[in-house]
Every structure is written in C-alpha cells, then in structure tokens.
C-alpha cells in the first residue's frame, strides 16, 4: 500500500516520515474553523488611497506600459500543461495533472475558452474557481484552528487558466524589470533563497573581515498571504503598467475566489461550508505568489530610495543595499541605527497603509560595530512596532539558516546532519521497496544537505564521514551487505547499481551548478556581481577545480543543468570503471561485458522493478560480488590477513569442489534436484506456462498453478490447444532428450511451440542456449517427420542465476506467441523469479552446517 501511495502522493508519505504533519487526533470543530478563517478572509479591507508614498510610486515606478493584447494560444497552453505535476493533490474535481497531460485533443478548444475569459467575452464558471483548501497542522496542538496552514488545491482547469495568466504577467515583469533585484521570488532564472543567502553571506563576511558597522532587522509578516487587500492587488498591477486586459481578467478571478476547508483527522474528518475570499491570495497557486510579490514590490522600490549599507572596500563603496526580500521574509540593512529607524518608518507606514501587520514575537534586530556584535537591551520602537534585540548568544533563523552576525556553521551543520540521518533511518526502515527507498533517499533525505552546500563551508572529510555513516545505517537496517561494494551503491540502476546519490557527489554537482548560476546571474544583478567577486576564492574556485579534475568544459555560458548532467555522467563512468576493475566484486560485471551476445541493457532492467525488497536486493548484489560467507571466501580472507588458513574449502555438501559462490548457486550436484529445480527453474517455467495461457485467453489461466506445482507431468486442454507440462514425447527413433519443459499444441492453427527453461551461471548463459538448441534438435526433427502438417518452433528460455540474458531471448519469446509490447515486462518478471530463487538457494545452503 505504501509503495502504491508513493507513486500517487509522495508529499504525504514524506510528511508522515518527517513526523511534523502527522494525522491529528483531536481536530477543531467545524464551527470554530469557520469562525476563525471567515474572520480572516471574509472581512474585507482596503488600502489607504491617500498615502503619501503612492504619488511617488505613480511618478517613478514603471514607465513602460504593455501595448499588445495577450492571447491564449494552444502553444501557450501546451507550455503550461507540461509544468503540471502528475499526482499533485487535486481540487474539487478530484482530477490530477496526469490525465490532462495525456489528453491532447481538448487543448485547442480549451485555449479558445480561456482566451474568451481573458478578453471578457465569457464569464469564468464558479465551479472552475472554487478551491479545496487542506488545513495542515503546524504543530502537535491541533485542536486550535489557528495552528493550521491552509494549502489551496484548485481544479486542474483553474490551474491551467491561472498558469496562462501567470505566464503573461511574468513576461511583462521580466521585459520591464518590474521586480527589484532585492526580491528573489517570482522571477525566472533566480535561485530564490540561495541567491539571498549568498548575498547575505557576502555582507556578513565583509562586515567581519573589514570591521565594518552594521545594523540589521529581521521582520516577519503575520499571515501575509491572507492579509493583502484585493483592491491593492489590482492597484499594484496598474502601477506596474500591466495591460488592462490582464488586470481585468485577474480582477474577475480574485473577486470570485471561494473555498471549502477540510481537515483529515485520524478518527474523523471535517469539511466547512463555502468561504469567500474578500482579501488575501491562495497558498499553493503559482499566480498568487507573483501577485503577492507585486503587492509588496513597491515597498522594495521605496526602500531603494533610502540609504542603507554600502558594500565594497573603502574606495569603492558604490553599491547600496537596504534590504533583501524573499516573498514575505524581509531583512533590512543599514550602517547605523539612525538609518535603520528611517527604513523601519518606510516599512511600517507602507505595511499599515495596505493593511498588513507584523508578528512582533518573530521580529528582531542586531547591531555590530567594527565587525563585532554590540549588546543591545532596549527594544526598537517605530510607529507602534516594537522589536527586541537579538541576544549575544542567540541566533535568528533566516531562510532556514541560523545566523547572527554570521552563519553559525557548527550549529547549522549539526542540525541538517541530524535531520538527514533521521530521514535516512525512516526511509530505510520503512516498508518501501528497494526502488522506492532509493527515490525517497535521493529526493527526501539528500536535499536537506544540498540546501546548505555553497552557503555553509563543508570540508571533504565531513562529507565523506556522512557518506560512511549513511552506509552503516543501511547495513544496520539490513539493506546493504556489510562488505557490499561502495562504488556500486552509487552507480545508476541502469548500470547495475543501487542508484543512491552520494553526499560527496551531490556537493560537487551543487558547486558546479552554483558556479554557472553565479556567473550568469552577475550579468544582470549587481548584487550577484559582488557575490561573483566575493566567491572567486570560494565556491567558484572549488567548482573550477572540480571541472578540471573531471575534464569538463568550464565555459560559463553553459546552462547549470547541462553542466550538471555532463558532470554526473563523468562521475558515474568513473565509478563504473572502478567497480569493474575490482578483482572479486567486479568479476561478474567484467566478464559479462566481454560477451557480445549478452543483452546488457535488458539484463539490468530487472533493477527497475518497483516491488523488489531492499533486503533481497542487497543480498543478490552480495552474491554477484562473491561476498556471502562461503568457505572459499573465509579461507581467502584468512590468507589476506596473514593468518594460518588451515580451513578446508571443499563444498560442505558434495565434498568434491571448492565452495565458492558459483558452486553454491548453480554447481552443486547435491543441490540440483532438491533446490535448483523447484526454487528457480520450476518457478520460471510455471510463470511462462501461465502467461502463455493468459496470452491465448484461456479461462482460468492461473487456476492450476498450485496443482501444477505438485505434478511431475501434466496436460491441460483449452479449446483447440493442449498445454503439456514436462511430458515426454514419443518418437519413431530413440531420442535421449525428449522431455522439454513446456509444449503448446494448437491443433487449429497447426502449430507447436516447445519451450525449454534453464537458469545456469550467468557466464554460461550463451553456452547453455547453444547447448539446448543442439540437444533438442534431434527431437524437433523427429517430431517434424511424425507430424508433417504442423509447424514447430523451439524456444530456449535461458536466464542467468542473477538475471543476465542473451539478445536472442526477445526473439524466442516473440516466436512462441507473446506480444511484442509485453515481452520486456515478461523478461523482467522471469529475471526477478530467477534472482529470487538464487537468493533462496544461497540462504538455504548457508544454513547447512560446515
């Protein structure tokens, strides 16, 4: 169940693992929820139209008006549709983006309807705008309605429409540079929080290294998204000279916003009546983010007209910064407390005029003189806003990083490492399959660390230590053999690895992409230009050394994503080469790559199976790496350690051959009939028997499976077909090999399919295929002489003990009637059955006393 849910809704699985947003037990009543949220959203508010700063904005804010009307074309709609997430929580229509992305025939008609709504020729239906707002608990105190965060889930149709409007609004803002450099949200080509953290880090380093004076204030808006008046949203669009057509379309949308609140408790569920939005924007909508950014962007414009902190050396202090904005997270900078008071006066006046308030308990300020924090005891009061100073030993959490005058490296690294290990334990001790654990590890655990790379200073030894501890956790939870190959863990699954991201590799890739981004962003953003100069001996230098070591093009014009892809390919290639070159661990992979008749891509496709257990996967890879505890391995380890190797390495059962991995899984004659045949060979053969019946639409295709397991010989008849299981064929002359595994007679079509299954050692797969064709050649010739009206087809189905197959297998399966499109799936399933049998055989063998 958890594996199916992960493919549909990853976020809910991750929230459960994180433990922050678990399903609440005591949820608030419907009446209390409606009373609280109606008091916020349905209470209409207006901005102060007599504000003194409004005239300044009208004169200087934006000079270039949009002249051309917008049109929703099928091409625009296609671009918006491709950005839809497949399984994101649906709105009231309960339809996910998966279906809209695959149904293309509707788009021309839908584009026409959206264009009519944009031009005002048609009204937007109420059902399309109506949202379903999910209340997510912020903490364990879930019985209070104010302890929930509202996340709006809109109908897919509405997401497509607002996506088109967002595209047009983005185009206008970008072409006219409406959004200031200080605001990192709602802009294309920006890295949001990372850009702000890098600029902030640069200022901190300069203050400390050059012993500068600095005053800074952290401000937090109270319910920012829920407070902004709708008339100010529209006025901010007009100030930005947005085309009246687009302004009118957005106004028609916002005035009809409605939603129903819902809470999913462990014992009960709650759904409210319809609530109207008379102020605020929807959380979770792309257009709403940009609307909010444009609503607070005039504040950035006003702050830029004041004096702040001048960056640079004593002779080159020509770049002034007063603040940094990320959506509603605001940090102010100035050279002294008097300048800061002027900045706060602008902020408080603007915020009061547009009806937004600050959460005073989450605001703080700090003063530094000559590069050191000065203790302040008195609160800072401006226009009724009281801000308390940050303690000398305290930190403020800004954009996810704890800071004071500088980022607290040990504290932050300790926090993210602890959170990372917590997530790793949750993932690898869960019931997820091996493939899904890999997905969760790479997308839920690794990003915790990646967010800090380039912002905090990490040493190579710290990164390697995290990788080592990660592998230990995987071993302790039984997901990795204690002697499993390190390189193979981080190789792609398409190359036979586990597909995990290494922390060290993630660090290298992050710094390479960050270098490209900083250099490219410095062309248009003066603050990022300063970051480029500041990081010349930091992130950029390390990234250039990495590019040189990987022998990659260091051209700054290459897009960060393309540069990362090239680096990942080189790193994976190096890991693969290292793994293959290892004498014992890489033996099987090395030998199989030498054989041109092996279909390497198909042979490794079984590792993409989403149902395979991680414990099972770890054990089969240990078998392939010859790391299970055979006598041969024990004796070899004793010799390597310099101890006396007086152990007998002969097989504990047959006492004839050396007990190595190849002998255990496919070479011991004492294991052949008791274990090799029933646990592996017969499992593959039974699967093919049932799939053949299913392909032929035989009734009860799986009814005789248990009965078939107990029978040495069996014949099943369905209409004009006969299915023979292990039946000897009587011929005119004596034939030694006359008992193939499966024979399918089609008396109507006059065809006969003969299937012979074998699961030898992987290195012997091609030899076994040739051998089967030779030894059954005489039988086929005799049958052709006896049944001249029939056409005979022989198909040797050979799959190695650990899943390797030849390039002929697809053709053999096609020859006996399997549909071409189903053959890859069939091969993966017989590979898994063969591998599963090998694991059972090895574990059974190791239980026998030596």
Q: For each of these PLM feature ranges, what is it?
A:
Residues 143-176, 192-198, 222-225, 276-309, ...:
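Conserved pre-motif C helix in the palm subdomain of viral-like polymerases
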Residues 86-95, 133, 143-153, 194-238, ...:
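Conserved catalytic palm subdomain of right-hand nucleotidyl-transferase polymerases, strongest
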Residues 221-343, 361, 367-368:
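Conserved polymerase palm-domain catalytic core
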Residues 1-146, 156, 160, 386:
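Surface-exposed loop/turn segments and immediately adjacent short secondary-structure elements
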Residues 384-460, 478, 513-528:
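Basic, alpha-helical interaction scaffolds
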Residues 639-645, 699-756, 770, 798:
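Active-site metal-binding core of divalent-cation-utilizing nuclease and nuclease-like domains
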Residues 466, 479-646, 650, 831-835:
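Extended C-terminal regions of large enzymes
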Residues 264, 358-394:
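Short, conserved micro-motifs composed of acidic
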């Amino acid at each position: 169940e958890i594996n199916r849910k992960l493919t549909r809704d990853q976020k809910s699985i991750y929230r459960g693992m994180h433990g922050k947003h678990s399903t609440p037990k005591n949820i608030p009543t419907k009446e209390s929820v409606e009373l609280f949220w109606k008091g916020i959203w349905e209470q209409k508010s207006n901005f102060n139209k007599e504000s003194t700063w409004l005239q300044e904005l009208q004169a200087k804010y934006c000079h270039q008006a949009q002249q051309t009307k917008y049109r929703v074309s099928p091409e625009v709609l296609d671009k918006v549709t491709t950005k839809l997430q497949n399984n994101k929580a649906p709105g009231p229509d309960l339809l996910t983006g998966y279906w809209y992305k695959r149904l293309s025939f509707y788009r021309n008609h839908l584009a026409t309807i959206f264009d009519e709504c944009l031009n005002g020729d048609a009204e937007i239906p109420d059902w399309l705008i109506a949202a379903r707002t999910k209340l997510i608990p912020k903490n364990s105190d879930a019985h209070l309605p104010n302890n929930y965060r509202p996340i709006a889930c809109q109908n897919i149709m509405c997401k497509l429409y607002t996506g088109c409007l967002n595209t047009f609004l983005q185009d206008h803002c970008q072409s006219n540079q409406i959004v200031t450099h200080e605001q990192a949200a709602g802009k294309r080509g920006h890295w949001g929080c990372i850009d702000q953290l890098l600029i902030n880090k640069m200022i901190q380093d300069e203050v400390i290294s050059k012993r500068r004076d600095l005053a800074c204030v952290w401000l937090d808006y109270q319910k920012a998204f829920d407070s902004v008046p709708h008339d100010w949203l529209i006025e901010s669009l007009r100030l930005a000279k947005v085309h009246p057509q687009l302004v009118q379309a957005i106004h028609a949308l916002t005035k009809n916003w409605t939603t129903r609140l819902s809470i999913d408790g462990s014992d009960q569920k709650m759904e409210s009546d319809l609530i109207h939005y008379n102020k605020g924007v929807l959380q979770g909508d792309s257009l709403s983010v940009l609307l909010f950014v444009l609503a607070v962007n005039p504040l950035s414009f006003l702050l830029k007209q004041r004096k702040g902190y001048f960056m640079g050396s004593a002779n080159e202090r020509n770049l002034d910064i007063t603040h940094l904005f990320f959506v509603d997270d605001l940090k102010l900078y100035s050279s002294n407390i008097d300048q800061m008071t002027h900045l706060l006066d602008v902020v408080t006046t603007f915020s009061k005029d547009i009806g937004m308030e600050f959460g005073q308990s989450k605001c703080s300020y700090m003063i530094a003189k000559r590069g050191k924090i000065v203790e302040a005891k008195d609160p800072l009061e401006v226009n009724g806003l009281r801000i308390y100073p940050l303690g000398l030993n305290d930190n403020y959490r800004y954009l996810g990083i704890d800071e004071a005058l500088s980022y607290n490296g040990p504290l932050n690294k300790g926090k993210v490492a602890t959170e990372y290990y917590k997530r790793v334990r949750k993932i690898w001790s869960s019931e997820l399959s091996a493939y899904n654990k890999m997905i969760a590890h790479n997308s839920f655990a690794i990003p915790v660390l990646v967010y800090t790379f380039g912002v905090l200073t990490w040493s190579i030894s710290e990164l390697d230590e995290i990788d080592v501890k990660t592998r230990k956790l995987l071993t302790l939870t039984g997901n990795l053999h204690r002697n499993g190959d390190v390189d193979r863990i981080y190789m792609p699954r398409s190359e036979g690895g586990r597909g995990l991201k290494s922390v060290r590799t993630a660090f290298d890739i992050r710094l390479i992409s960050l270098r490209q981004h900083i250099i490219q962003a410095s062309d248009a953003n003066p603050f990022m230009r300063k970051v480029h100069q500041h990081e010349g001996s930091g992130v950029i230098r390390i990234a250039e050394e990495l590019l040189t070591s990987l022998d990659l093009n260091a051209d700054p014009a290459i897009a960060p994503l393309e540069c990362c892809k090239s680096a990942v390919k080189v790193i994976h290639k190096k890991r693969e080469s290292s793994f293959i070159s290892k004498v014992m661990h890489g033996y099987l992979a090395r030998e199989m790559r030498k054989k041109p008749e092996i279909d390497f891509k198909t042979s490794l496709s079984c590792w993409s199976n989403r149902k395979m257990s991680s414990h099972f996967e770890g054990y089969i890879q240990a078998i392939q790496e010859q790391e299970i505890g055979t006598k041969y391995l024990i004796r070899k380890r004793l010799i390597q350690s310099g101890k006396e190797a007086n152990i007998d390495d002969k097989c504990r059962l047959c006492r004839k051959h050396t007990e190595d991995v190849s002998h255990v899984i496919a070479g011991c004659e004492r294991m052949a009939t008791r274990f090799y045949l029933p646990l592996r060979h017969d499992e593959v053969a039974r699967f093919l028997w049932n799939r053949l019946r299913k392909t032929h639409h035989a009734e009860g295709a799986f009814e005789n499976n248990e009965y078939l397991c107990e029978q040495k010989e069996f014949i099943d008849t369905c209409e004009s077909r006969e299915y023979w299981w292990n039946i000897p064929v009587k011929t005119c002359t004596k034939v030694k090999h006359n008992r193939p595994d499966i024979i399918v007679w089609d008396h109507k079509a006059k065809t006969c399919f003969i299937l012979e299954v074998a699961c030898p050692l992987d290195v012997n797969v091609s030899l076994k295929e040739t051998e089967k064709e030779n030894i059954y050649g005489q039988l086929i010739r005799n049958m052709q002489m006896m049944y001249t009206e029939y056409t005979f087809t022989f198909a040797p189905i050979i799959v190695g003990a650990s899943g390797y197959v030849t390039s002929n297998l697809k053709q053999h399966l096609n020859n006996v009637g399997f549909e071409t499109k189903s053959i890859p799936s069939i091969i993966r399933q017989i590979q898994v059955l063969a591998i599963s049998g090998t694991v059972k055989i090895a574990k059974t063998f190791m239980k026998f006393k030596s």
